[in-house]
Amino acid sequence: MFNGIIYQQGTVSKFLKLNAGTKIFIKSKLKLDKKDIGSSIACDGVCLTLVSKRKNLLEFYLSKESINKSKFKYLKIGQKINLELP
């Protein structure tokens, strides 16, 4: 359960469009390990599953439905995004 406390802001660094959705890459200094892959992180209020983490780069997958129903369709490279842990 998310508690509404924003732990940090990340920066949108890359989008990778796929047939069924989009991968989004966010630069962040959140202290996460490989064991956290599969965990949920709220990104600007949208609960996303962490797909991969490399150094300070977090990777998430967004389905087309998630993009269309959220503000993620308006995100731009370099934009700040709030990150919240459960």
Task: Show which residues each predicted segment covers.
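Conserved loop->alpha-helix
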Residues: 1-86
